[in-house]
A protein has these predicted regions:
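Accessible peptide chain termini
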Residues: 1-2, 207
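Bacterial N-terminal signal peptides
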Residues: 2-11
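Sequence signature of WD/YWTD-type beta-propeller architectures
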Residues: 16-395, 401-407, 419-439, 444-456, ...
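Low-complexity, Pro/Thr/Ser/Gly/Ala-rich linker/spacer regions in secreted
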Residues: 473-475
Length: 475
């Protein structure tokens, strides 16, 4: 393969850059870019079947060569720059037979060290405060691949999952408020969904507080999500694409908006997007027709204010260029102080009003909810079992203790034990976590009524479900 030859010499390529001064700031930033001869859709670990590399270039510098920073690797991807822009995390694969692992190098490509040493594929790393990293771990290949978000020390020690249910969780980026931005399926179901989408979620670095950030459109998927300076989230949103199609349109969620909005035209195909400077982002855009076997992704600037594409920043006739990130310092994200109690094996969950549901007429479920049945998801095959039932008060409130780190979902029962509404997504609580919800798929734009729930007036302790001596859990 061509990467064997690349490993024998320092690779410098003359490239074509934009010379349009209107597109470029006074000091164009350096970029880290992933280049690949072939980009494949599908499983995260199989995106680059012929290999890939990370190069550094000066955006907007005409005819300046690029420098290969990952010589000796069959494939490298997912560059993530440290807040001081001195170091870079990336996913690397020394040979085609080895799994992806997380590596770190200096910004110029020297001083490489391996962070993770897993038997599974580890990709999409991001820097966390206080010498930690987060990444996506993929435990299998093909259509049934399962992925979870992991956190580890910067040397790879104390690696542990922070997501526990189905959904194919993938790390997208770290928000300035200290939460991790994830993408995963919606709903978070272990059963195939014909109209399933991939949506954005937020989670704390200790795995608590998982919440849907925005629900995606039916059949859509999100990739390459990152935060802009004004707090907007920008990402690539694809519709009903085929199994061999890659990319989609640019979309964003602005602060205070309830829904995402497409900001590019149908027919344009983008593979990645990342903040550049001011109102500009750097995008990877397909430059040839989608049905062309020689289609490539090239780098362009895109103005989010005018919603117009700028001139090409970089073009290589041999490789697609994508996942471009600016090699620039940025503010350090806030550190989240965990309040979990890892000596406990349970978590608590309170629902304020199970009647609240944005899917029901008038926003409220009809009928009388008498109890809630709790189901747990266990084992590699995803078998579910009933953990128990608990009472629901007349105001729709209930309060539970459940085993920690166990995916659970709920079924609302009437006075005869008939299911009124069944939750599709699996959720969990971390050890010692107190987790609350406003209702049953309630409207996120509305706050709960300012009242003390009846369940807390009648019971000062939660109802235990699935708690027994065999699992060692105690309320």
């Amino acid at each position: 393969m061509f990467f064997l030859a690349l490993g024998l010499l320092t690779f410098l390529v003359q490239a074509e850059f934009s010379q349009d001064g209107k597109d470029l700031p006074a000091a164009a930033p350096r970029l880290l870019v992933v280049q690949a001869a072939e980009v494949a859709a599908g499983n995260l670990a199989d995106r680059f079947p012929q290999g890939s590399r990370i190069v550094q270039l000066q955006s907007g510098a005409p005819a300046q060569p690029v420098v290969n920073l990952t010589q000796g690797f069959f494939a490298a991807a997912d560059p993530s720059v440290s807040p001081d822009a001195a170091r870079v995390l990336f996913a690397g694969r020394k040979t085609a037979r080895e799994p992806w692992q997380i590596w770190e190098m200096k910004a110029g490509g020297s001083g490489k060290r391996q962070v993770t040493h897993e038997h599974a594929d580890c990709l999409q790393p991001v820097y966390l405060p206080r010498n930690q990293v987060a990444y996506t771990r993929v435990d299998s290949h093909g259509a049934g691949a399962a992925s979870q978000a992991y956190v580890a020390d910067s040397d790879g020690g104390h690696a542990h999952p922070i997501t526990f249910g189905p959904g194919g969780f993938q790390v997208e980026s770290l928000l300035r408020d200290g939460r991790i931005l994830l993408s995963a399926s919606w709903p978070l179901s272990n059963a195939p969904q014909a109209d399933a989408a991939r949506a954005l979620y937020v989670i704390r670095t200790d795995g608590s507080g998982l919440n849907l950030f925005r629900q995606g459109a039916s059949g859509s998927a999100v990739d390459s999500a990152s935060e802009l300076s004004d707090g907007s989230l920008i990402f690539v949103q694809s519709g009903s694409r085929g199994p061999h199609e890659w990319g989609g349109q640019l979309a964003w969620v602005q602060p205070g908006r309830l829904h995402s909005q497409l900001i590019t035209q149908p027919g344009e195909v983008f593979a990645s997007v990342h903040a550049l400077d001011g109102d500009r982002v750097v995008v990877s855009r397909k430059t040839l027709p989608a049905n062309s076997s020689s289609a490539r992704f090239d780098l362009y600037s895109f103005n989010t204010s005018t919603r117009k594409l700028g001139s090409a920043l970089y073009h290589d006739p041999q490789y697609s260029s994508l996942q471009a990130v600016a090699l620039e310092p940025r503010p350090t994200a806030r550190y989240y102080w965990t309040i979990l109690h890892y000596d406990l094996k349970t978590g608590r969950l309170i629902c304020l009003d199970a009647y609240q549901s944005q899917d029901a007429p008038g926003g409220r479920l009809a009928g009388t909810i008498a109890a809630v049945r709790v189901l747990g998801l266990e084992g590699e095959q995803g078998g579910q079992r009933v953990l128990g039932t608990a009472p629901v008060e007349s105001d729709g409130s209930f309060y539970l203790t459940v085993p920690a780190d166990l995916p659970v979902r709920f079924e609302l029962l009437d006075t005869k034990g008939k299911v009124l509404r069944a939750q599709q997504s699996w959720v969990w609580t971390r050890p010692g976590e107190d987790r609350g919800c406003g209702g049953c798929h309630e409207d996120k734009a509305q706050v709960p009524a300012n009242r003390w729930p009846l369940i807390l007036k009648r019971f000062d302790v939660p109802t235990p479900v699935g708690i027994n001596a065999s699992n060692g859990a105690k309320p």
